[in-house]
Amino acid sequence: MTLIKSISGIRGTIGGQAGEGLNPLDIVKFTSAYATLIRKTTTNKSNKIVVGRDARISGEMVKNVVCGTLMGMGFDVVNIGLASTPTTELAVTMEGACGGIILTASHNPRQWNALKLLNEKGEFLNAEEGQEVLRIAAAEEFDFADIDNLGKYIEDNTYDDKHIEAVLALKLVYVEAIRNAKFKVAIDCVNSVGGVILPKLLERLGVEKVEKLYCEPTGDFQHNPEPLEKNLGDIMGLMAKGGYDVAFVVDPDVDRLAMICEDGQMYGEEYTLVTVADYVLKHAPGNTVSNLSSTRALRDVTRKYGCEYNASAVGEVNVVAKIRATNAVIGGEGNGGVIYPESHCGRDALVGIALFLSHLAHEGKTVSELRATYPPYFIAKNRIDLTPETDVDAILAKVKELYKDEEVNDIDGVKIDFPDKWVHLRKSNTEPIIRVYSEASTMEAADEIGQKIMDVVYSLAK
C-alpha cells in the first residue's frame, strides 16, 4: 500500500490500514482539511463544492466518501459524475462554486486514486494552500456541521455538453473549416472518461469519421494509461494500416493529449503544445510559457512571431502563475498539456484537439508534413540515485557555480542552457534522487550532454 501526501493533493493505492493507503479514513481526513481551508479562504458565498471523477474502479467508493464528508462539513455538493479534469475545473467557475475536488490519479495504474484540490477559480491550490491542508489534516482541526447546517447533494450531468459548447465558442475554433476537411480520426481513451466526451466533441466539430479504441468508461485500462509511445502499440498499428488523418490519445482524466500521424508514427507529445501555440500565435501574437523541462521548440516558434517566451518551474500551478504574470496567450507542459487562457487556466485536451484540427484544416498538410515544419529536438530522461544523507541542494549549487558562464536558471533545480542544447537537474521531494532532462537536435547529443552532467554530479557526490 502507498499513500503520498503532497501540496498538490493526496494520492495512493486503494486499501490498507489508515495512513498506509488511500482508504475511507484518510479520504475523510483530507477532504475535511480541504473543506476547512475553503471555509476560511473563499470569497464566494455560494457554499457549493463541485466533485467530478474519472472512470477508475475505485471512483464510486471515493466519490461517496468525499461527497458525504463535504456535506458533513456543511457544504452543498454538486456531483457532476464521470467528468474530465478540465470539465470539472470549468464546472467550478460555471457554478460559482467555492472550490472543487477531482477524483483521479491521472496516468497512474488502476489501483491508484487521488484527490486533486481546486480553488474557486477552478485552478489547483498553490503551494502555501496545499501546505495548509496538510497541516490541518495532521492536526485534525475540523469542525463538522450540526443537524441544521448539513450540506445538500445535487447531481448535474450536463457539464460535458457545457464544456463542449465552451470549446466550440472559442474564436480560433473553426468548425466549418474542420467539417469541410472531412477528417477521419481515431481515438484511444484508455477506457476512461475521454471515451464519453471526445466522441461528442469530434461529432460537434464536424469530423467525418471517428474510430473508437478503448472508449468504454469502465476503468479497466487496456494498457498502461500514460500516453507514451511504448504503451500505444494498438492505436499506432491501426494508424499504420492507413485510412485515418490523425489519432488522438488521452490519459484517464483528459488533461494530456498525445497524437499519432497518418502513417502510424508518434507526433511527439512535446510537440502538442508547440503546434497549438504556432496556430494561436499566427492569429493572436503574444507571450508563451512552458516549464523548464519542456522542449526548446516552443521558444523557437514564439520568437518566430517576434514574441516572448518564459519558463516556469515544473507543475501546472507554476505554469499558470507564470501565464498570469506575463499575460501569456498560451502555455502548458511538454507532456501534452495545453493551457489556453482564452478558455481557462488548466490543461485541457479538448481545447488542444479543437485548436489542432482548426490548424490542420487551414494548413492543408498531412499531420506528418505539419510535424516536419517544427524544429527537431530530442529529449533524454535519466535519474541519479543518491544516498539519503547526500546534500542534494549543495550539489546543485556546485553545478550552478561550475557552469556560471552559461545561461543558468535555478527557479526549479538547475537548468543549464547551452547554445544548441540544455540540461535540467531537479531533485525529488520524496526520494534521494536527481531527475535529469537533456535536449539537443539529435538523441545521441541529448544522451551525451545528459551523461556528461550526470558524471559531474557523481563526482561531486563522492
Cite the ranges covered by each PLM segment.
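An N-terminal, well-structured beta->alpha segment
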Residues: 1-68, 72-73, 152-184
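Proline/glycine-rich low-complexity loops and linkers
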Residues: 71, 134-165, 169, 261-334, ...
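Gly/Ser/Thr-enriched, mixed-charge loops and adjacent short helices
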Residues: 13, 113-240
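N-terminal small/polar loop signature for handling phosphorylated ligands or for N-terminal nucleophile
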Residues: 36, 48-112, 200-260
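Short glycine-centered, acidic/aromatic-flanked micro-motifs in structured strand/loop junctions
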Residues: 51-54, 187-189, 261, 342, ...
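Glycine-rich phosphate-binding loop of actin/hexokinase-like ATP-binding domains
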Residues: 101, 114-115, 119-133, 255-282, ...
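Phosphate-binding and adjacent anionic-ligand microenvironments
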Residues: 246, 284-462
